[in-house]
């Protein structure tokens, strides 16, 4: 059974030596007097039916037999080194970052990165939470240079493979990683068991310096630069990648068992290879050469700084990451009193804690509970990268719409390099991905469109509303759908008398599920009234509804949502709530952040919101990623 115990496995042993196993009791009818023994598998346990010996072999016996075949215990004691036990490097051995601002520019840091991401992570030790729609451009549609990570979207699990609750099920998760030669499971021997055990995949500068200094018990590292000549453009990037892969292959064929990819040498003459591209190129090249398990992979880079960056890097093959520039930025922010009353060491510790917690949350979206299982899994989809580029560097990653290739990636890297070393800019770019800012990313909902919408509502001006809808549709091409047009037939459409009338069509419309609390009381009620007038249906979302809305208004309008949603937090779900629905909707994934559950910040839980949700006002409300009583298709059917 899986380590989480999510897949039930119950069994009977009958008096005539039959074994009946199923996910539920009663799948096969059997008289009670015929049952000699019964039981269920516990998380991580095994059951083996030996048809030759005519008996069931228990979990303990199976594992005891395997564990004693070879001296694994001795091998582990002799050949596994724990990072916490090795001699720590001196402060003088840790490289310093010269000209922090220039390096931040070269790696595409923005003011938003500092304020919205790094400060909360270093101050609070948590991955920051936001509450708004994503109306910024896809990476391929942005007019700003994009980091390569932005072209990859995380995949997630639903009913057949439920996500894990990384908070409530933390006991079954593990962030520990093993660095070095992975050995050969089909031919186990001592030579292949040397490894360095690390508590998390995020390394401090001191920890990496200690690993670099390690040259004992067959743990040796080699550092390769991930830099290219900016004067040669895309050709320079291509040549640098080819040389990198050749040197990585050479290292894997020698006695080195730790390969460190480093971009610390960035300067006026050297631009950084995008870290994700370097990692994926080396990882897949070594796989093609059947050498990947011969060597561990560490990234020493100034580029990654947020959770999605770390996840893509681990997913495409890196074992551990030293985000040296992010850590240096944390210390700089602390020195400038931007993090409150905490020490530099505590700020760095908080940042790493937030990063690791975020990695666990993303892994849990796929039902994966250990970093070692997520490592190299490539559970992403590319959006805006062409097939040739993907097939060479990101093998087997889905990419459906095409897009840029190595030349485009090189141009974006060079744009960041030029800003750092060929301009006299004195401030970081604003960013603006999380909200509209001057000279930042475009947004569908920006001052112009919001002003048009508000003016149309305040004045009841339909012409203004049409201006607003036209601006949303035509002026800001930030989504794929905004690029599409209907191909109307030449000579006009279908005669109006041959098509279904509007009144009939709208009855099949359903409003999106937005909870009361996520949107205001007025908006939630207005949507319900409008949909009921049309004969369509509105959806309550997961936040319950005030019982007063279940009764019609004096003018005949109804504020009752005919579709009632049941989410994993069960907020507002009562018998009265359920009986006033025409349709019940069990929400298995959050549309805005699938696999993560729901989260309503405490500041949005007003007294009326708390009343509808049967919760305490001002207290943050979290719906766990899975329903804790729905872990299979069978559970959902029940």
Language-model region placement:
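Alpha-helix-loop-beta-strand connector modules within alpha/beta enzyme cores
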Residues: 273-297, 350-355
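Conserved catalytic micro-motifs used in adenylation/nucleotidyl-transfer and phosphoryl/amide-
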Residues: 1-20
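Active-site-adjacent beta->alpha loops and helix N-cap segments on the catalytic face
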Residues: 268-281, 332, 336, 630-633
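Conserved helix-loop functional segments at active or binding sites
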Residues: 230-233, 246-258, 264-267, 284-291, ...
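Glycine-rich, proline-tolerant flexible connector loops at the mouths of alpha/beta enzymes
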Residues: 261-277, 547, 619-626
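Flexible, glycine-rich loop/tail regions that form catalytic "lids" or insertion modules at the edges
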Residues: 23-27, 55-237, 247-251, 255-258, ...
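Conserved, mostly hydrophobic/aromatic
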Residues: 47, 263, 313, 370, ...
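Catalytic cores of alpha/beta
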Residues: 303-317
């Amino acid at each position: 059974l899986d380590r989480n115990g999510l897949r039930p496995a119950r069994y009977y042993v009958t008096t005539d030596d039959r074994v009946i196993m199923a996910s539920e009791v009663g799948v096969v009818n059997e008289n009670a007097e015929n049952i000699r023994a019964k039981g269920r598998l516990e998380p991580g346990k095994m059951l083996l039916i030996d048809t030759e010996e005519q008996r069931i072999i228990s979990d303990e016996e199976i594992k005891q037999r395997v564990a004693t075949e070879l001296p694994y215990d001795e091998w582990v004691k002799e050949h596994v080194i724990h990072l916490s036990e090795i001699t720590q490097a001196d402060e003088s051995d840790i490289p310093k970052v010269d000209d922090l601002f220039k390096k931040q520019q070269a790696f595409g840091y923005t003011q938003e990165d500092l304020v919205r991401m790094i400060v909360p992570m270093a101050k609070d030790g948590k991955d920051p939470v936001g509450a708004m729609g994503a109306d910024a451009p896809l990476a391929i549609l942005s007019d700003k240079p994009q980091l390569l990570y932005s072209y990859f979207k995380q995949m997630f699990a639903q009913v057949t493979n439920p996500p894990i609750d990384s908070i409530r099920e933390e006991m079954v998760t593990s962030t520990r990683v093993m660095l070095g030669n992975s050995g050969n499971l089909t031919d186990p021997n001592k030579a292949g068991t040397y490894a360095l055990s690390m508590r998390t995949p995020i390394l401090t500068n001191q920890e990496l310096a200690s690993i670099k200094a390690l040259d004992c018990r067959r743990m040796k590292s080699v550092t390769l630069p991930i830099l290219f000549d900016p004067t040669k453009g895309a050709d320079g990037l291509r040549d640098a990648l080819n040389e990198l892969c050749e040197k990585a292959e050479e290292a894997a064929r020698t006695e080195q068992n730790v390969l460190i990819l480093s971009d610390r040498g960035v300067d006026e003459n050297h631009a950084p290879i995008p870290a994700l591209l370097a990692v994926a190129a080396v990882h897949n090249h070594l796989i093609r050469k059947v050498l990947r398990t011969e060597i561990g992979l560490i990234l020493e880079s100034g580029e990654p700084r947020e959770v999605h960056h770390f996840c893509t890097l681990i997913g495409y093959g890196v074992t551990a990451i030293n985000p040296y520039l992010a850590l240096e930025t944390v210390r700089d922010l602390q020195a400038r009193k931007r993090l409150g009353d905490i020490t530099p060491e505590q700020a760095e510790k908080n940042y790493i804690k937030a990063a690791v917690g975020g990695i666990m949350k993303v892994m849990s979206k796929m039902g994966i509970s250990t970093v070692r299982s997520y490592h190299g899994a490539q559970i992403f989809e590319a959006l805006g990268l062409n097939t040739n580029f993907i097939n060479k560097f990101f093998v087997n990653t889905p990419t459906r719409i095409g897009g840029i290739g190595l030349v485009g990636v090189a141009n974006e890297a060079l744009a960041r390099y030029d800003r750092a070393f060929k301009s006299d800019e004195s401030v970081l770019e604003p960013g603006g991905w999380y909200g509209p800012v001057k000279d930042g990313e475009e947004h569908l909902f920006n001052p112009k469109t919001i002003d048009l919408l508000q003016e149309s509502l305040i004045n009841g001006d339909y012409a203004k509303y049409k201006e607003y809808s036209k601006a949303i549709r035509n002026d800001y091409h930030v989504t794929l759908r905004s690029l599409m047009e209907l191909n109307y037939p030449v000579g006009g459409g279908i005669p109006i008398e041959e098509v279904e009338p509007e009144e009939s069509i709208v009855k099949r419309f359903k409003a999106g599920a937005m909870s009361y609390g996520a949107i205001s009381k007025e908006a939630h009620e207005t949507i319900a009234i409008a949909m009921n007038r049309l004969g369509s249906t509105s959806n309550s979302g997961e936040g319950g509804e005030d019982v007063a809305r279940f009764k019609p208004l004096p003018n005949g309008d109804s504020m009752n949502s005919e579709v009632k949603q049941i989410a994993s937090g069960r907020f507002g779900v009562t018998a009265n709530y359920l009986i006033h629905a025409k349709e019940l909707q069990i929400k298995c994934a959050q549309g805005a952040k699938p696999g993560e559950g729901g989260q309503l910040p405490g500041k949005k839980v007003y007294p009326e919101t708390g009343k509808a949700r049967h919760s305490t006002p001002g207290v943050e409300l979290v719906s766990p990623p899975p329903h804790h009583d729905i872990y299979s298709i069978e559970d959902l059917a029940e």
